[in-house]
């Protein structure tokens, strides 16, 4: 079992093209998980406070939503993963009477984790510096099981009223059903 650690401070991100006078900004959040649950290369997945650059992993479906929904409906160009990895975001963090700007680099796209991920080392450092009076409680859990088609898992989660993300329990049931059919 792994825990998601939430950011306990305010975060905003911006990007734009100064030459064109375009600037986009939004409030956002970060979460982190232990490295062993990250499903992309860890080669660029480290935080160095002195470098002032935050590695970020976003869900692949965010890029797909942009490319096949927003961009397509507005005749905008699609963005590749390679191009997105070249974009640097301006990240503003606020809390504990501090306001600091860092750069954010997208270093990967997750198929499994539906959140805006930063390294655990960054999250621990940032929560300590921007929200020292708060204790970061896990916001969600990652549960890895040997056999996701085991109905006891589904039953247990339903009895406890636990929510699962992405209907993974239903996918397990479907796999079980297909195995049952192919065995007949």
Predicted feature locations:
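Domain-start "cap" segments at the beginnings of catalytic or binding domains
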Residues: 23-24, 34-41
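Pocket-edge structural micro-motifs
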Residues: 32, 60, 166
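Peri-transmembrane interface segments
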Residues: 147-184
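Basic-flanked hydrophobic alpha-helices used for secretion and membrane insertion
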Residues: 1, 9-13, 38-49, 54-162
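Short, basic, helix/turn surface patches
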Residues: 29-33, 184
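Short amphipathic alpha-helical patches
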Residues: 14-17, 86, 177-181
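Hydrophobic, regular-secondary-structure patches
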Residues: 1-30
